[in-house]
């Protein structure tokens, strides 16, 4: 639970950040700086505390809509929009840091990148990534949105785009909104089918990755471990 502890320092959050560095500030202090001002009833620190206590975790705050933010006393439309913009900007910075654009270097790196990109998806998405001979990304395409058992019916559309792009390599990935990374029987059957289909047309099937809850499962890594 968040609480506003008595500040042993004579400095306000902005001054503390300037002289001590941002890593020394609490979540409440950092949010107070982003809010800039408080209200007649609350200081920026108290308002920041009210927000964090309301949503309980940073992850809940990250998912909060403009209307949900406006439910808090002192948070109007303008501040709600500013908070949403701040969250989205942070997301884009994090995406840049997590991912080397243009090339797949390993199942781990790409799996973690996809786990971040797909973490807010409430439905299952099947995504195909098409690569050239240097593992550079030619195209990343969402093939299907919905239940996996429907998405796994046929690899035909995946291979259609692979051939169209003159792809040398292929990765496929889908998310489990539940966060459970254990592959289902349908996942295993699909992996076998798409791998065989790639072999038939001379495309290197690199991996099938399952993502959820910020992590990933790699069929390729699992096979290597056996």
UniProtKB/Swiss-Prot annotation:
State the Pfam families in the record.
Answer: RadC, UPF0758_N
Domain MPN as annotated: residue spans: 103-225
Q: Name the residue ranges of motif: JAMM motif.
A: 174-187
UniProt-listed CDD domains: MPN_DUF2466 (cd08071)
Q: Which GO terms of type biological process are on file?
A: proteolysis
Domain of life of the source: Bacteria
Question: Which positions in this protein are listed as binding Zn(2+)?
Answer: 174, 176, 187
Q: Looking at the keywords, is Metal-binding present?
A: yes
Leader sequence range is none
Q: Which family does it belong to?
A: Belongs to the UPF0758 family.
Task: Specify the protein name.
Answer: UPF0758 protein LL1007
Question: What species does this protein belong to?
Answer: Lactococcus lactis subsp. lactis (strain IL1403) (Streptococcus lactis)
């Amino acid at each position: 639970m968040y609480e506003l502890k008595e500040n042993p320092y004579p400095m306000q959050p902005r001054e503390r950040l300037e002289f001590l560095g941002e890593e020394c500030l609490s979540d409440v202090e950092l949010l107070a700086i982003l809010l800039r001002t408080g209200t007649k009833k609350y200081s920026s620190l108290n308002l920041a505390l009210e927000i964090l206590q309301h949503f309980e975790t940073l992850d809940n705050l990250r998912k909060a809509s403009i209307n949900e933010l406006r439910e808090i006393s002192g948070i109007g439309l303008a501040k709600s929009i500013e908070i949403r913009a701040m969250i989205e900007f942070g997301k884009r910075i994090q995406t840049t840091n997590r991912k080397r654009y243009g090339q797949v270097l390993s199942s781990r790196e790409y799996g973690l990148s996809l786990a971040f990109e797909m973490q807010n998806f409430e439905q299952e998405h099947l995504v195909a990534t098409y690569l050239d001979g240097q593992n550079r990304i030619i195209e990343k395409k969402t093939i299907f949105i919905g239940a996996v058992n429907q998405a796994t019916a046929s690899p035909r559309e995946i291979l259609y785009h692979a051939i169209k792009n003159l792809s040398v390599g292929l990765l496929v990935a889908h998310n489990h909104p539940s966060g459970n990374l254990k592959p289902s029987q349908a996942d295993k059957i699909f992996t076998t089918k798409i791998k065989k289909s790639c072999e038939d047309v001379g495309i290197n099937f690199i991996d099938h990755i399952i993502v959820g809850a910020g992590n990933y499962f790699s069929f390729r890594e699992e096979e290597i471990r056996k």
